[in-house]
Amino acid sequence: DIVNFRNVTASGTATAFSLPCMFSHLPRARFNIDDSYQSENLLDVMQKAGYDVLWMDNDGGSKGVARRVPYIDLMKEGNPEFRNGDTFFDEVLLDGLEDRLKNISKDTVLVLHMMGSHGPSYYKRYPDAFRKFAPTCDSAEIQNFPTEEIVNTYDNTILYTDHVVSGAIDILKKFPQYEAGLLFVSDH
């Protein structure tokens, strides 16, 4: 079953702020980035409660959220098949996921930190097979391109993100023995 939470807003416009806020016990109005480093976050609490926790990162770091839990930096350790210049396509997060799930022996939380639709280099966020909306803006200098091309390029990132999330759901469906769930949240 898929549930769409409609009344959800990001807590900030940059990953460096919004990600720690999302995992904090504090509401946005009381959240302070400096204080967040002095307190436990949701992952810390889950780990202390006995869950295995693993952060798999394809977006340049957890911004301190995963500093006390096991962490895999896929931008350094990712399968070269998914390499795109100096980054990786988000499908790298699915590579090996099925094998990880086969080896789960207790309650587990896996965080798949995606690159998603980060701009302004939207054109670098999806493989050519997902270039469905055209013409596209194939540059980080988006101010030099028509709005239609920027929107098309962004829409291609959404199409690809949907593909990756769908892939994760398909992998989870292979494990009916688990009471599994997938929560997709954009940090900004």
Question: Where in the sequence are the language-model features?
Answer:
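Active-site-proximal alpha/beta segments of enzymes that process anionic O-linked groups
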Residues: 1-138
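Active-site-proximal segments of metal-dependent phosphoesterases and phosphodiesterases across multiple
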Residues: 130, 147-164
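Metal-dependent active-site segment of extracytoplasmic phospho-/sulfohydrolases and closely related
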Residues: 157-188
